[in-house]
A protein has these predicted regions:
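Conserved anion/nucleotide-ligand pocket segment
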Residues: 148-164, 168
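Extreme N-terminal starter segment of soluble prokaryotic enzymes
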Residues: 1-5
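Single conserved hydrophobic/aromatic residue that forms the stacking wall/gate
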Residues: 165-169, 173-177
Length: 177
């Protein structure tokens, strides 16, 4: 079974995280939420409290097929300030496995140089932070092992794009119906 990790930082965009997790789980992808702090309790950008499946130090990330960053502020900035998150993203990318980010979070990938020469999209206003990317403004961009999404209103597009990489056609039909 495929495995996806959705990182949660305080201030994350709730729709982007829960929508993505829901779509991937419906597609039969083993999807875990992981707090980037030592506390499983994470507060979203709109003050909704979530309990992550694990903390960063409690889970093995080495076999994840996809590492996913929801946006939201200050969540995306908190992800960007986490050296352990950035280290695993770089390793994942180097190994050719999926790194994905939506809304403001593609700035993390841009800052790591993972968008150089790739098509990418993000929430309006964050385009300058997608260093080296060809910013398209599309709902979702899939360029090699990098997936980016524009924002919360397009979370279904983002989640489906990720699921299409990992699920069979019959399962795909169930997820989108």
């Amino acid at each position: 079974m495929k495995k996806a990790i959705v990182f949660l930082a305080n201030g994350f965009e709730e729709m982007e995280a829960t929508g993505t997790v829901d779509i991937l789980r419906r597609g039969g992808i083993d999807t875990k939420t992981v707090s980037i702090t030592d506390d499983r309790k994470v507060i979203g950008a709109h003050n909704m409290e979530y309990t992550a499946d694990a903390t960063f130090t409690e889970i093995d990330l080495s076999d994840a097929d996809a590492l996913i960053l929801p946006g939201g502020m200050p969540g995306a900035s908190n992800l960007n300030n986490s050296e352990p998150v950035k280290e695993v993203l770089l390793q994942q990318y180097r190994e050719g496995r999926i790194v994905a980010a939506i809304c403001a979070a593609p700035m993390v990938l841009g800052g790591l140089g993972l968008l150089k020469g790739r098509k990418a999209t993000c929430y309006p206003g964050f385009e300058p932070k997608l260093i080296g990317a060809t910013v398209t403004g599309e709902a979702v961009e899939v360029d090699g092992n990098v997936v980016t999404g524009r924002g919360p209103g397009l979370v279904f597009n983002f989640g489906l794009a990720l699921s299409l990489i990992h699920i069979s056609e019959p399962t795909r039909r169930v997820v989108i119906s």
